[in-house]
């Protein structure tokens, strides 16, 4: 067992507090895979994962190992998320269905810095509840359910990542273990 700080900050694989699965975050600013100095993965004092330096193309990955996962299975994703004042605002919740990423809920469009984008969530600086149920058209015989939260735009207008943050929050009432949650509902 490794502590959450080491799991996420060093290994990029924060294990679920209950059940199986993990959270990772992928920074994509540098094409060689190296991190920009403003891009970090952190565990806050409450145990909540957050990152600095989010950039268009970055994503949170939520992965749950499965066997004999049948087509037509419904999976519910719930979570609280928020950004700092200089965090990236436009994100898409997507799920891997076969070999394609699909939007987990209705999409919207916006023009950001002259570019038209498609997104599912406009993330505020106060906690936003996400509660989405998606139906997987394709089964998974032996693999993982994959859901990602993908950064769709550079809303800061800068040329490189800044220190703005995005986090998965939770509540003290539940020991900070209630967000995000992924569960099969049908």
Task: Please state what every model-predicted region is.
Residues 57, 66-78, 83, 88, ...:
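Extended extracellular/luminal ectodomain segments enriched in beta-structured repeat modules
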Residues 99-107:
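Surface-exposed loop/edge segments in extracytoplasmic proteins
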Residues 1-2:
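Boundary/junction segments of secreted and surface-exposed precursor proteins
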Residues 79, 92-100:
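Short beta-strand segments and strand-loop junctions that repeat across beta-rich extracellular domains
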Residues 60-62, 75-77, 91, 130-132, ...:
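Hydrophobic residues positioned within well-ordered beta-strands of beta-sheet architectures
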Residues 13-71, 176:
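Surface-exposed, low-complexity/disordered Ser/Thr/Gly/Pro/Asn-rich loops and linkers
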Residues 101, 113-186:
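Terminal, low-complexity interaction segments
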Residues 54-63, 78-80, 173-186:
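Aromatic, loop-rich ligand-recognition surfaces of beta-strand-rich domains
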